[in-house]
């Protein structure tokens, strides 16, 4: 198998890099198109642009495919977060149900957590207050509700203080 990256270009207003790879093997020539989040792309050894085909070994090809999958999981996660709040646990489960491997779902959840898209502590506090004030739930009922929504025990404990 021979693989060459034939195109690397910024995409999505610089938030991603688009790559086109030509692969020749016993099946013939085929092209793969991938998008990688800029944050992940900077962690690779790939140049930001090429003037001639750039040889890609099996390890590099595997890395590109994985990072492209993680980028797709981030895009899917953003769409999910646009419509409703999700805990890390719930978002991970939804991404896996959409067909992403657990590793890519974990990577996307870490991205959202590190970049402030998921604030479980703030959401748990707000929900605990709402349940106590509006629905007049007691601590145990609030704890059960928060746990049912996927909040971790430590986050629940802090929200109830």
Residue ranges and their predicted role:
Residues 1-161:
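An alpha-helical, amphipathic repeat domain used for nucleic-acid recognition
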